[in-house]
Amino acid sequence: RGILYAKYQTGSGERKKKNNAVASVPKNAATGASAKASSEETNKNNFAKNAVDGNPRTRWCAAGGGAGQWLKIEFKEAADIQNIRILWEKNNAAYRYTVEASSDGKNWKQVVDQSKNKDVKQITPHKIDAKGAKFFRITFHGSSTDVWGSLWEFEAHTGPLPELPRKVMKAA
C-alpha cells in the first residue's frame, strides 16, 4: 500500500509543514514482477517484461496471432489480489482471454473467463478473489479483428482499482 500526501498553504501564502494523508493507494503487486511469454515480438522490443513495468507506453506483444499465446507473471511475493486490470493494445477489438492465478506456478485456478468475449474494450477491469497469489497467467484465445495478443499493462491490486490517468482513459 502507498499513501499520497499533500502540503497545503494558508490564505496568506504561508506553507504548513504538516503532511496530511489524502488517499490510500492499493498496491499493484504486478509492477516490477518478472514476466515470461509463449513468444515476444522482439524485433519491435515488445517484450513480456513491458506488461508489468508500470509504463503504459511500453507493451508486450506475441510474435504471432494464433490462439494459445500466453503471458505469465511472477510477483516478488504472494499477495491477496482483489482486482486486476488489463490495458490491451487495440481499442477496436474484442479480446478473448482467460486469466488464471496460482500460489506455486503449478496448480492454477481460473479467475477470469472471457474466452467468448464479444465486447470491444481496451481496458478490462475484473474483480477477483485470488488469496496468496504469486503467479498470474493470461492466455489469449483470439479477437474479433484477428489482432495479436498484445497489452500495454497488467495490474493486480490488493484493494480497489485506482483511477487511471485521464490521458490513458482518453486513449481508450
Describe the predicted segments one by one.
Residues G2-N19, S39-V112, K116-A172:
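Aromatic, loop-rich ligand-recognition surfaces of beta-strand-rich domains
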Residues V22:
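Aromatic-Pro/Gly-enriched surface loop or interdomain linker
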